[in-house]
Every structure is written in C-alpha cells, then in structure tokens.
From Swiss-Prot:
Disruption phenotype: No visible phenotype. Serk1 and serk2 double mutants are completely male sterile due to a failure in tapetum specification. This is Somatic embryogenesis receptor kinase 2. Residues 62-81, 100-105, 126-129, 148-150, 174-197 are annotated as: Leucine-rich repeat receptor-like protein kinase binding. Homo- and heterodimer. Component of the SERK1 signaling complex, composed of KAPP, CDC48A, GRF6 or GRF7, SERK1, SERK2, SERK3/BAK1 and BRI1. Bind to BRI1 in a brassinolide-dependent manner. Heterodimer with PSKR1. Interacts with the EF-Tu receptor EFR and FLS2 in a specific ligand-induced manner. Interacts with ERECTA in a EPF2-induced manner. Interacts with ERL1 in a EPF1-induced manner. Interacts with TMM. In the presence of the signal peptide RGF1, interacts with RGI3/RGFR1 and RGI4/RGFR2/SKM2. Binds to the peptide CLE44 in the presence of TDR. Its main location: membrane. Residues 263-628 are cytoplasmic.
Length: 628
C-alpha cells in the first residue's frame, strides 16, 4: 500500500510538472509573447508597470496594458506616460495584428525600429515625447492602414521619407519639434497637412515651411497693391474726405489680408484637413445627475494627469486622484479606447447605462468627459482604497481590517454584484471580480468598482468582452477555456475574493513555492482544510480576533462559489441570503452529499487509480462543520 501511495504521489508530481511546463511553453512559444518579453527586457521600468508581463500568466492577453482580439492575438499595446526608458526592439515587428502602439510620453531612446514597417494592420503609432534619434524609417510607408502618426518632440534627424505620402488613410500627422531636414513633401496624403505638423524643424524647407530649399527659386511674393487713381466725382469730395477714404480702404485691406491668405490656402488644399491640436473642451452639460466635465477642468484637477496622482493602473486605463475647483476629491479614470465612427454616441449611451446602476454597494459614476482624443470617467474618491491594498499594502500605522469589517465587506460586495446581475436591464457582468476592484468608503462599506467598463470600451475586437483578461487565480475555469463569461464567472471571482478576505493572501502567488505550497490560493486553502489546519489559513493580522465558526461559514460560501461547474455555483442573490444566515446549512449539506456520490462513481470507474482527483473533489473530507 505504501508503494502505491508513493507511485501515486510520483505520478501526481509528474502530471503537475507537465502542466506547469506546458503552461510555460504556451506563453514562451507564442511569438507575440516572445516579442513583448524582449521589449520588457530592453526597457527600464521603475514603476513596475510591466510587472504582470509574466510567462506564467497564460498568454500576453492576460497582461495589463495589452489588448487582444477574439483569436487571442495582440492588437494593442498601451504604455503611454509610464516613465519607461531604454530602447525598442526589432521583435515588435512580430505583432502582425497590432493596431495601436502607444508609447508616448516616456524616456525611450535609440532609433525607431524599421521592423515597425511590418505591422501592416497598424492604425495608430504614438511615439511622441520621447528621446528617439536617427531617421524616420522609410519602411513606415508600408503601413497603409495608418491613421495616426505622432513622432513629435523627439530628436529625429534626416529627411521625411517620401514613402509616407503613399499612406492615403493618414488623418493625423505630427513631426514637429525634431531635427528633421530637407524638403517637406506636398503630394499625396501630405497635401492635407498644415505647417503645424512640421513646426520647429529648423532644417526643413519647402512651401509649407515658408523657407525655400537650396537651389529652388525663391517664393514669389504677391504683387504689390497699387491703388487706383482718385477721380473726383461730380458731387466733389474734399481732399480730407479722399484721405479719409484712403485710410479706411487701407485699414480694411490690412484686416482682410489674413482672411484672403487663408481663403487662398483653402483653395490650394483639399477642403478637409487634419492636424493634432489640444482637444476641444466640451461644453458643460448635465444628463440627469450625470455631469459632463470639460477636459480642461480634469486637467487642472489632476495636475495635467501627473504621475504623482496615479492611484492605479489596469486593463482599462489609469486612475488619477483629482481635486475639483470646489475642493471635492475625485478619482478620474482615463480610458484607452479605439475611436470609431459613431463612437461618441455609443460612449454616451453606455455611460448613461452605467450611471443608472445606483446602489449602496456600487461605485457611483459622477460624470464623464468626451473629446475627439479622450474618454474619461469621474468617480467619487474612496479614501480607504481597495480591499487588496488594505490587506496587503497597508502602512504600519494603519490597523488591519477587523474580522467584523471583513464580514461586512463580504456581504456588501455580494449585494452590489447581485444588483448588477438581477436589477440592471440589461444585466451587467463584471468579468473581473477581485479584491483590487472592491473599494472601501469612509465607513469601510464595500463598493464594487470597474463594473460596466467591458461594455463601455468601444473596441471592435477586444479581450475585454470575449477573451480572457486578468491574472490566474481569479479566472473561472470555463472563462479560461472558452473566453466566454456569464454571471457565474463573477460568482467564481467573488469566491476567490472571499478567500483573499479570510487569508489576506494573493489569489496567485509564486512566493508560496518557497514553502512547497500551491501557488493558487484556492488549491492552497483546500490543501490546508484537508489537513484540518484551519488556523493556518486565517490571516495572521487578525491575531485570533475572529470566531472560528464564522470563518468556517465564509469558507463554505467561498467553496460553493468556486465549484468547477458554473451550473453548480449559486447565484449572487443566493449568496446574499446565505451570508444573511438563510440556507447555507442546507446548501452545504446538499452539496456534500452530491460530492460523496460523485466520488463513489469515480472510484468505481477507476478502482486502481485513487490519485485521479479534480481540484474541486473530495471537499467533504475537509470536515467543515455546518453553520452554527
């Protein structure tokens, strides 16, 4: 018997190693993952913005600042304003389906890789406000889908490639504030652009710069104006009247000259042209209780979106702390979003939908801002941060969350999610329930945040709505395997969040390997329960200031919520009732009986293979007592 157990243990270890190496291979063998890993290795990241770019996190589509389409192929890399330095890598050219490369406002140096010309699906290339040097690659002229090209405020040198004039889709061009030289093309797509696109390049020449190129004939000035001779009229004007009339005519001509010049420019150029200018400030309007802020108002509130005001970063964008003119503190979420025709109306519709989800345990949307270049959401500022920060990032001066507060958080967040599922029309699926997305107000009441953003983000193809996002440990099995989410996906995430509340630990933590423990919080908890070590899984910060029976009850709810089959998980409304003391004992007893029967069937089917255990099986052996 001992030999059997040893062999079974060895087989389980072998299977575990194979699964681990398989998951690593899936990420490392992914060409796109390799390319992004090369980029991360070549960049200096003082703020750990790229911390989630880990090969153990399934694939690049689960990493922050990366967006994928339905086929789990990278379509967007958003690393703007991230304080990154270092150089880009040629491997970026392997991201064949990439549409948006956002690297603006960093400290990146070196050349712009010519391999970016292989990104034939690229729509937007934003490299402005860096320290790039060298020429603009001629290969960028192969990007025939490019609409936005911003290379301004760098140290680029050499001529403007003529190949860029072949990009007929180009709508926004900014090459200003560089060290470019030579003639500015004025044919093809470049006929659309005005001098502002090329400003502050002292060695550029050509008609658009008002500086003739060497060897070219000077620009012909307009012919001088010769006033017609003054002919006395029959009525006779005095000399004073003639002089006054001449002065008036001259003044009129002086004021009309700019208008005439602009009219000449419009006749010379096509009627419609584009260039990058600061976004127009929207008029302040109210949609019910929802306020529409101007961009300028939010820029002032956040000190121009200063890094020092960043509260957090996520897959939807960055969150900034801000102070409005009346002194009110707010949290401003700056979304990353694809601009599509009709997107403004869609955005406003979805914003209004989110604003109608009003509940004590939901983060209330206070307002929004929409401009041609920005989408922002304004929320009340939550002084106590998130549950995750209170559990794992609290300063020594801050007391740990008491057990009673943790129970209050469990019930409040369940009520908020239940409202999203059962009382919103259409229902809202959160898709990313975890401790980091549960905020705490001044009274430590749980407030569910980031709901509705998956619908709000107006992407044609995005992992936010149809493919896996987030990190291992929070993701329901069916979501991980199919990319399809449901309200039961939220239930699973909620169950993991309960385990975070109880243990104070992360849902996925490689540091647990140091003690030969499971990296997945769910498996780690189950292992301790099977060994009847309940006291070892409770957060040490509680220092035994909890009731064991209440901990057992919360664990039971968590295990019911994290069953592998979504059909067997309770609805959030049922979870609320169980936490309120209604029906947990019956639900737990019923579930245990089903588990016993299922295991008996499995053992009869595999009489010599007692090692075949699903991660959700054999939980009756934990011998958790029922609610008391």
């Amino acid at each position: 018997m001992g030999r059997k157990k040893f062999e079974a243990f060895g087989f389980v270890c072998l299977i575990s190693l194979l699964l681990l190496f398989n998951s690593l291979w899936l990420a490392s063998s992914n060409m796109e993952g390799d390319a992004l890993h090369s980029l991360r290795a070549n960049l200096v990241d003082p703020n750990n913005v790229l911390q989630s770019w880990d090969p153990t996190l399934v694939n690049p589509c689960t990493w922050f600042h990366v967006t994928c389409n339905n086929e789990n192929s990278v379509i967007r890399v958003d690393l703007g304003n991230a304080d990154l330095s270092g150089q880009l890598v040629p491997q970026l050219g392997q991201l064949k389906n990439l549409q948006y490369l956002e690297l603006y406002s960093n400290n990146i140096t070196g050349p712009v890789p010519s391999d970016l010309g292989n990104l034939t699906n690229l729509v937007s290339l934003d490299l402005y406000l860096n320290s790039f040097t060298g020429p603009i690659p001629d290969s960028l002229g192969k990007l025939f889908k490019l609409r936005f090209l911003r290379l301004n405020n760098n140290s680029l040198t050499g001529p403007i490639p003529m190949s860029l004039t072949n990009i007929m889709t180009l709508q926004v061009l900014d090459l200003s504030n560089n060290r470019l030289s030579g003639s500015v093309p004025d044919n093809g797509s470049f006929s659309l652009f005005t001098p502002i696109s090329f400003a502050n390049n002292l060695d550029l020449c050509g008609p658009v710069t008002s500086r003739p190129c060497p060897g070219s004939p000077p620009f012909s000035p307009p012919p001088p104006f010769i006033p017609p001779p003054i002919v006395p009229t029959p009525g006779g004007y005095s000399a004073t009247g003639a002089i006054a009339g001449g002065v008036a005519a001259g003044a009129a001509l002086l004021f009309a000259a700019p208008a005439l010049a602009f009219a000449w420019w419009r006749r010379r150029k096509p009627q419609e042209f584009f260039f990058d200018v600061p976004a127009e400030e929207d008029p302040e309007v109210h949609l019910g209780q929802l306020k529409r802020f101007s961009l300028r108002e939010l820029q002032v509130a956040t000190d121009s979106f200063s890094n020092k005001n960043i509260l957090g970063r996520g897959g939807f964008g960055k969150v900034y702390k801000g102070r409005l003119a009346d002194g009110t503190l707010v949290a401003v979420k700056r979304l990353k979003e694809e601009r599509t025709p009709g997107g403004e109306l869609q955005f406003q519709t979805e914003v209004e939908m989110i604003s109608m989800a009003v509940h004590r345990n939901l983060l209330r949307l206070r307002g929004f801002c929409m401009t041609p270049t920005e989408r922002l959401l304004v929320y009340p500022y939550m002084a106590n941060g998130s549950v995750a920060s209170c559990l794992r990032e609290r300063p020594p001066s801050q007391l740990p969350l008491a057990w009673s507060i943790r129970q209050q958080i469990a019930l409040g967040s369940a009520r908020g999610l239940s409202y999203l599922h059962d009382h919103c029309d259409p229902k809202i699926i959160h898709r990313d329930v975890k401790a980091a997305n549960i905020l705490l107000d001044e009274e430590f009441e749980a407030v569910v945040g980031d709901f509705g953003l998956a619908r709000l983000m107006d992407y044609k193809d995005t992992h936010v709505t149809t493919a896996v996002r987030g990190t291992i440990g929070h993701i329901a099995p069916e979501y991980l395997s199919t990319g399809k989410s449901s309200e039961k996906t939220d239930v699973f995430g909620y169950g993991i969040m309960l385990l975070e509340l109880i243990t104070g630990q992360r849902a996925f933590d490689l540091a647990r390997l140091a003690n030969d423990d499971d990296v997945m919080l769910l498996d780690w908890v189950k292992g301790l329960l099977k060994e009847k070590k309940l006291e070892m899984l409770v957060d040490p910060d509680l220092q035994s200031n909890y009731t064991e029976a209440e901990v057992e009850q919360l664990i039971q709810v968590a295990l019911l919520c994290t069953q592998s089959s979504p059909m067997e998980r309770p609805k959030m409304s049922e979870v609320v009732r169980m936490l309120e003391g209604d029906g947990l004992a019956e639900k737990w007893d019923e579930w245990q009986k089903v588990e016993v029967l299922r295991q008996e069937v499995e053992l009869s089917s595999h009489p010599t293979s007692d090692w075949i255990l699903d991660s959700t099986d054999n939980l009756h052996a934990m011998e958790l007592s029922g609610p008391r």
